[in-house]
Curated annotation (Swiss-Prot):
GO terms for cellular component: cytoplasm; excinuclease repair complex. Residues 39-424 form the Helicase ATP-binding domain. GO terms for biological process: nucleotide-excision repair; SOS response. Residues 441-604 form the Helicase C-terminal domain. InterPro entries: Helicase/UvrB_N (IPR006935), Helicase_ATP-bd (IPR014001), Helicase_C-like (IPR001650), P-loop_NTPase (IPR027417), UVR_dom (IPR001943), UVR_dom_sf (IPR036876), UvrB (IPR004807), UvrB_inter (IPR041471). NCBIfam families: PRK05298.1, uvrb. Belongs to the UvrB family. PROSITE patterns: HELICASE_ATP_BIND_1 (PS51192), HELICASE_CTER (PS51194), UVR (PS50151). Pfam families: Helicase_C (PF00271), ResIII (PF04851), UVR (PF02151), UvrB (PF12344), UvrB_inter (PF17757). GO terms for molecular function: ATP binding; ATP hydrolysis activity; DNA binding; excinuclease ABC activity. The UvrABC repair system catalyzes the recognition and processing of DNA lesions. A damage recognition complex composed of 2 UvrA and 2 UvrB subunits scans DNA for abnormalities. Upon binding of the UvrA(2)B(2) complex to a putative damaged site, the DNA wraps around one UvrB monomer. DNA wrap is dependent on ATP binding by UvrB and probably causes local melting of the DNA helix, facilitating insertion of UvrB beta-hairpin between the DNA strands. Then UvrB probes one DNA strand for the presence of a lesion. This is UvrABC system protein B.
Length: 676
């Protein structure tokens, strides 16, 4: 297995400190949790659990532990929504450090597949999000360059990317005073996946007389300007990528590739040889099956020619083990391989994230089986895959599992090293659920909703057992003039994002769904959580899920939870006992310290586009995904036109508007909850 390597000519990785900045100090259970977790990591305890209730400040505790331990850190979240939220929070806690974001960069992804029964081949189709691609490259650049790096990632971190050895060996180190033949330098930039372009754009370079401007693949706010006298490099400046106004001068610079899949020429030649060898063996296997034999020969030889000519081909990831030198069946290289041996792994919402880690491999292998069996791909395609859970566990050398309801697996792995964080800084205790009959539950719920709506700014979450029931209840409430909406996996990303925004802004008062846990809904405005048919045992009626649902009302001083059930199931019984235990701990603490429960003030996330910019563009502050994509395209065109006309102030304005729209689009797309 490939592990951390820094082959940048022996250059030292920057050993900066994590500097935590926060307007408050640890309180309640936080100081002891921080002390125990930090000491456990430094003492070599491989696995610990932070059992923290909703609203107890687990993220702040994690930030303090990271600052204390001071090693590169990976925070793993189970979906894009939570990854985005954690990224924003950690950026605020560590503004001087490298806080990065690594999720799947596909806006749309249809994997390659073959359906044998209908003889249907589905070609891979995808749309890559340029902004996320930049953030992914920024993440790997940071972890190779500096130890004060914190990467927040989705499950995407266990999927194969190019090896850190190949990636970093293609980095280009330039120093003032040295000679670099211009033609060779340009050719090297092309091999690094930078393209020659007259316009300023990411992953491109522009030659003008004695100057080469490089627009970095992993940075949108800075470009690099190289100035030469003949072939001697006399100046390196960081500049604004549009105005090219210098920011600061440096004696040297390291330029990283524009793709994780770049490879040195020697590696590429070796890969071509081993691909041909595998092809020859597979053609013998298909002896007597001319259709599969011809198909595989044509497809693979075409790919080989593309790799020879341009160093890349469509679907090159299917040949990944040939480029990394791995043996068949060996784990692929992934983001985890970019980290040093002593890195800290924090698995957030571990009760959901660990089952995901287990599931990723099986789904990937079943799809590729028919592609290999019918000659669309070589068997080495099987090795372009996510890690198995057992392979991923090899990286669990220093891990903290974080959850309000840790699963059996985390508890076993931690071997008793479970640190509780029950006390909420707000003083709000867990609401003790009321059990009411399931018979007549809708009428009873309606009365509860009406009582809540008489109060200002209070919201209601309703958990149903089926999508159809969620839709029916929303329609029923709407007929009665109640602002209600349903939310489930059948809702498109853009619409789901808008529903969540409307709930926060007050346009919607009641939200009905099947699995509202996955949406990351944690709002102080929610004062009532109602679980319909709570006695129907299943995944979303397990004791862990029921405790999580209760936590959704624990941020409001008037929080109330109602379980509609005709019997108390074992899951409900466990939930009631655990909730009472946690509630009593909080009440005792409040009494001892004379604390009065108070609500938290959680600001509504504003549109990142400035008011001035929004007014000039005459668009509403809350835009749909389609509107944002259209805005980005318009701003980009206007930016390039202004730059070409040397109207740099105007170009910078459109650049800022475009980047703000990209950030908002990234946040919206994160709301889809896709695991990668």
């Amino acid at each position: 297995m490939t592990h951390y390597h820094n082959p940048l000519n022996g250059r030292k990785v920057l050993n900066q400190q994590f500097v935590l900045q926060a307007p408050f100090l640890p309180c309640g259970d936080q100081p002891e949790a921080i002390r125990q977790l930090s000491r456990g990591i430094l003492d070599g305890i491989p696995s610990q659990v932070l059992l923290g209730t909703t609203g107890s400040g687990k993220t702040f505790t994690m930030a303090n532990v990271i600052a204390n331990v001071n090693v590169p850190t990976l925070v793993l979240a189970h979906n894009k929504t939570l990854a985005a939220q954690l990224y924003q929070e950690f950026k605020a806690f560590f503004p001087e450090n490298a806080v990065e974001y690594f999720i799947s960069y596909y806006d749309y992804y249809q994997p390659e597949a073959y359906i044998a029964r209908s003889d249907t081949y589905i070609e891979k189709s995808l749309l890559i999000n340029d902004e996320i691609d930049k953030l992914r490259l920024s993440a790997t650049r940071s972890i190779l360059e500096r130890r004060d790096t914190l990467i927040v990632s989705s499950i995407s971190c266990i999927y194969g990317i190019g090896s850190p050895d190949n990636y970093s060996s293609m980095a280009l180190i330039l120093e003032v005073g040295k000679e670099y033949p211009r033609s060779q330098l340009s050719a090297q930039l092309v091999r690094m996946h930078y393209q020659a372009s007259a316009s300023p754009q990411r992953s491109a370079f522009r030659e003008r007389g004695s100057v080469i401007d490089i627009f970095l693949a992993y940075e949108s706010d800075l470009a690099v300007r190289l100035e030469f006298v003949n072939d001697t490099l006399v100046s390196i400046e960081y500049t604004d990528p549009l105005t090219m106004i210098p920011s600061h001068t440096v004696p040297s610079v390291t330029l990283y590739p524009g793709s994780h899949y770049v490879t040195p020429e020697a590696v590429r030649e070796q890969a071509i040889r081993t691909i041909r060898e595998e092809l020859e063996q597979r053609l013998l296997f298909f002896e007597g099956r001319p259709v599969e034999q011809e198909r595989l020969f044509q497809r693979t030889t075409h790919d080989i020619e593309m790799i020879k000519e341009i160093g890349f081909c469509k679907g090159i990831e299917n040949y990944s083990r040939h480029f990394t030198g791995a043996a068949p069946g060996e784990p692929p290289t992934c983001l985890l391989d970019y980290f040093p041996e002593d890195f800290l792994l924090i698995i957030d919402e571990s009760h959901q994230t660990l089952p995901q880690l287990r599931a990723m491999y099986r789904g990937d292998q079943s799809r590729k089986q028919s592609l290999v069996e019918y000659g669309f791909r070589l068997p080495s395609a099987f090795d372009n895959r996510p890690l198995t859970y057992e392979e991923a566990r090899r990286y669990f050398r220093r891990v903290v599992y974080v959850s309000a309801t840790p699963g059996e697996l985390e508890v076993q792995e931690s071997r008793g090293h479970i640190i509780e964080q029950i006390i909420r800084p707000t003083g709000i205790p867990d609401p003790l659920p009321e059990i009411r009959p399931a018979t007549g539950q809708i009428d009873d719920l309606l009365e509860e909703i009406r009582q809540r709506l008489r109060k200002d700014q209070e919201k209601i979450l309703v958990v149903s057992v089926t999508k159809k029931l969620a839709e029916d209840i929303a329609a029923f409430l709407a007929e009665l003039g109640i602002a209600a909406a349903y939310l489930h996996s059948g809702i498109e990303t853009a619409e789901r994002t808008q529903i969540l925004t409307d709930l926060r802004l007050g346009t919607i008062d009641v939200l009905i769904g099947v699995n509202l846990l996955r949406e990351g809904i944690d709002l102080p405005e929610v004062s009532l959580v109602a679980i319909l048919d709570a006695d129907k045992e299943g995944f979303l009626r397990s004791s862990a899920s029921l405790i999580q649902f209760c936590g959704r009302a624990a941020r409001n001083v008037h929080g109330k939870v109602i379980f509609y059930a005709d019997r108390i199931t074992p899951s409900m019984d466990h939930m009631l006992k655990e909730t009472e235990r946690r509630r009593q701990i909080q009440l005792d603490y409040n009494k001892k310290h004379n604390i009065t429960p108070k609500p938290i003030i959680k600001p509504i996330l504003a549109n990142p586009i400035t008011k001035e910019g929004a007014q000039e563009d005459s668009r509403p502050e809350t835009q749909s995904t389609e509107d944002l994509e259209s805005s980005i395209k318009q701003y980009e065109e206007a930016m390039y036109k202004a730059a070409q006309d040397f109207q740099f102030d105007e170009a910078a304005k459109y650049r800022d508007l475009m980047n703000a729209a990209k950030r908002q689009l990234l946040f919206k797309q994160g709301e889809d909850g896709n695991s990668k």
